[in-house]
Regions:
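Nuclease and nuclease-like effector domains acting on nucleic acids or nucleotide cofactors
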Residues: 1-55, 60-158
Length: 159
């Protein structure tokens, strides 16, 4: 595995981890269905209606903008079809924009840095976050700690 691929994959994994945290708060970087939210919470990523995982798309492509390849803020989640559309129908085409799946609009970054996906409040959140409930915050913190430990354990097993 090349260094570029390893860095890119780490950024995508980190972006999914961040998305999981957002979903736990009733938020996300796109409008996830309740089923997709549940998948993010339980499996670490979302799946489309055909059971295919959403893909992490480097808005500023890793090939053309290697300085951004390891940054999880440069990742947006798209279905395979949306991802291909973001590349103008050819995977070899570099990207330098945010792709809006509902409108198919591309918001070009030009010579500037990427702009991270907007965090939105989900219309149908599966997690209800009580206001000012410290016990919930403690449970969430403990779950996050356990999730991090599990991921570290799995990484050690793979080595």
């Amino acid at each position: 595995m090349s260094r570029r691929t390893a860095e890119s994959n780490k950024a995508i994994l980190a972006a999914w981890n961040k998305e999981q945290e957002l979903v736990q708060e009733g938020k996300g970087t796109r409008e996830w269905t309740p089923k997709q939210q549940q998948d993010i919470l339980e499996k670490g990523k979302a799946y489309d209606d055909d059971g295919v995982a959403f893909q992490g798309q480097h808005m500023k492509s890793a090939e053309m903008y290697p300085e951004y390849q390891g940054d999880p803020g440069n990742i947006q989640f798209l279905t395979r079809a949306e991802h291909l559309e973001a590349h103008n129908g050819n995977w070899r085409n570099p990207t330098n924009w945010y792709f809006n799946p509902p409108t198919k609009e591309k918001i070009d970054f030009g010579d500037g840095p990427f702009i991270s996906c907007e965090v939105i409040n989900l219309a149908e959140p599966v997690v209800i976050v009580p206001k000012d409930d410290s016990s919930f915050k403690e449970q969430k913190s403990e779950k996050k700690f356990n999730l991090i430990n599990m991921k570290m354990y799995l990484i050690k097993i793979k080595k």
